[in-house]
């Protein structure tokens, strides 16, 4: 069983949902980022979704774009992100780790080399945000060759064919987008048809569904679980805490700890 499967099975047995925070690797620096990620795990994160700093992110709203820029300004490369992942994995052998990336980042290194490096540092799953199902083949093949689980996004406007494709090709978990647009903690609305999408994904035996985009409050975690999702992903709200505490690292870690504890409590 993969780390994601093991974690979902453990949570199911306890009748709990998953809380998964997202941060950008090396934001604001390599060392601080490591401490931030440790704080997330130590305070109850069930899995991690992590991004590589990239100058032209597609789905990212202003908060996560700023995080990318901070890491890039600090001079951090994709190889630094891999080294940081290696450090996280050696400290936390069990935590499921997923990467959320743009295709260009993978392409720059070469598909095979990228997924091989993911396997070497202990990544479990990779979601390529801007690869449609129709263009998935090379990515899926490279991922599977190296034992990495490919994850796909189910958008709120997905038709039956897309839902079927996402369910069939995703491994580890399924990323259900709450609404159209870019990531943001401000826009906390979600599409009206999410419960139907969850039902349809489950009917096609999709892996456990994690709902993301606009998840900033414990009530939204409860809502995601009530809709039938297995858990919720929170990116912008997590990264915002880093952004507003750049001059006070201790305060940053304290606020992150409290945020994760509250969000995790909502899954029980």
UniProtKB/Swiss-Prot annotation:
Short name of one Pfam family: Trp_syntA
Catalytic site: 49 (proton acceptor), 60 (proton acceptor)
Superkingdom classification of source: Bacteria
Pathway: Amino-acid biosynthesis; L-tryptophan biosynthesis; L-tryptophan from chorismate: step 5/5
Keyword Amino-acid biosynthesis appears in the UniProt entry: yes
Gene3D superfamilies hit by this protein: Aldolase class I
Reaction catalysis annotation: (1S,2R)-1-C-(indol-3-yl)glycerol 3-phosphate + L-serine = D-glyceraldehyde 3-phosphate + L-tryptophan + H2O
Catalytic class of the enzyme: lyase
Enzyme Commission numbers on file: 4.2.1.20
GO cellular component term of the entry, any: cytosol
Keywords: Amino-acid biosynthesis, Aromatic amino acid biosynthesis, Lyase, Tryptophan biosynthesis
Quaternary structure, from the entry: Tetramer of two alpha and two beta chains.
Protein name as annotated: Tryptophan synthase alpha chain
Organism: Haemophilus influenzae (strain PittEE)
């Amino acid at each position: 069983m993969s780390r994601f499967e093991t974690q979902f099975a453990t949570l199911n047995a306890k009748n709990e949902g998953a809380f998964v925070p997202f941060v950008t690797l090396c934001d604001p620096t390599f060392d601080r980022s490591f401490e931030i990620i440790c704080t997330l795990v130590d305070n109850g994160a069930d899995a991690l979704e992590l991004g590589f700093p990239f100058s032209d992110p597609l789905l990212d709203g202003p908060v996560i774009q700023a995080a990318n820029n901070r890491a890039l300004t600090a001079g951090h490369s994709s190889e630094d992100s891999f080294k940081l992942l290696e450090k996280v994995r050696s400290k936390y052998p069990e935590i499921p780790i997923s990467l959320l990336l743009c295709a260009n980042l993978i392409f720059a290194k070469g598909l095979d080399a990228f997924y091989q490096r993911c396997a070497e540092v202990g990544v479990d799953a990779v979601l390529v945000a801007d690869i449609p199902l129709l263009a998935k083949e090379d990515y899926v093949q490279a991922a599977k060759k190296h034992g990495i689980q490919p994850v796909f996004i189910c958008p709120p406007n997905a038709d039956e064919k897309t839902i079927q494709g996402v369910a069939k090709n995703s491994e580890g978990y399924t990323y259900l987008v709450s609404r159209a647009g870019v990531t943001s903690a401000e826009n906390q609305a979600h599409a009206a048809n999410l419960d139907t999408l969850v039902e349809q994904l489950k009917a096609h035996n999709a892996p456990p569904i994690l709902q993301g985009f606009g998840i900033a409050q414990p009530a939204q975690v409860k809502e995601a679980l009530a809709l039938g999702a297995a858990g919720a992903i929170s990116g912008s709200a997590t990264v915002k805490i880093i952004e507003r505490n750049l001059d006070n690292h201790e305060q940053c870690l304290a606020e992150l700890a409290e945020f994760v504890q509250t969000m995790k409590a909502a899954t029980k």
